[in-house]
Amino acid sequence: MCASGWNGAEKEKQSRKDIVRNEQLHYNKKQICNMRRDEQMQKKNYQKELDKKIEQIVSEKKVPRLFLHSCCAPCSSYVLEYLSEYFEITVFYYNPNIFPESEFEKRIHEQEKLIRELPAKHTIHFQAGNYDSEKFYEMAKGLEMIPEGGERCFRCYELRLREAARFAKEGRYDYFTTTLSISPLKNAQKLNEIGERLAGEYGVAYLVSDFKKRNGYKRSTELSKIYGLYRQDYCGCIYSKNQREREKKLREEEESSVKS
């Protein structure tokens, strides 16, 4: 059908598709630019730094206490398998960005299930944070339309890590860190910068990491299958959920047009 033959509904449909496609292209370009910038700026290899820290811990024959912020059970699976060999861990589930609240509760149950079933050399404890969704929405004001992976996400990192640092200080933990760097979509450089800055504020050491290295993400998918964990298809917040739904709808419309 030529463009002149389109009716109003078809034009509107095409317009929606163009908006979503342009939004995704813009996001992809921004992500590539950010990755290149981070590669140029990143002087630290966080995995190597973590290796050195663990070597030091082993040589001192200590078992430090680690306060580990977890975004979800699947992401924490590899991190717990890896770090429970060297640390006594408390998993801190604090994610006020999650939408809806039923999703928040579902992810808590999956986290508790994993902790019960995962073998660990040292004890793994669990602590659930409050569902402070109003804090997330206050933080996100004015950033609602920014694609996933931008400034809104960076502020969300800090919101969650700050709460982890606060509890780590109160509980007199040796270290705190987060599972977030295991995701290919999360900015490890930014996470570690925020973590180290908060360490200075709260007086608790931040355990630097880039858990996606050494096939960490791949191992998390394997462990998720082994333990039958629910793996969500969006980060957690309503904005990432809406973005995934728009992308899904676009794919379905394109597949439908090809078939017809």
Model-based region annotation:
Residues 33-260:
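Nucleotide-activated chemistry modules centered on ATP-dependent adenylation/adenylyltransferase
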Residues 19, 27-37:
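Short, positively charged and aromatic/hydrophobic N-terminal segments
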